[in-house]
Amino acid sequence: DYGWLLENLVFNCINNKQEVFYYSEKTECDFLIVKNKEIKQAIQVCHELNEKNREREIEGLGEAMKKFKLREGLLLTNSQEEELKLDGKKIVIKPVWKWLLRLEK
């Protein structure tokens, strides 16, 4: 399952540097990044956004962003890239390889 592999890759990269939690209420968000005891970022990971999962993946990220008052969320995929607005908040959809390159800076 490529989605599971991508999630594990992302988890291993962020878990070494930051405190990480999982969010689950009505929906789920894969990773919440904590800095100074405050949630600073929400990250959702899926291999590919498609008709079957797009709403679920974006809704999970959006719910976490709303609950923790985050203005921006990150959705990492294998190759897709776009930006969209959800309830006035920005969701950045980015290939995981581009995100990995930014971690090195």
What spans do the regions from the language model cover?
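A cross-kingdom feature that marks ATP-driven nucleic-acid transaction machinery
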Residues: 1-105
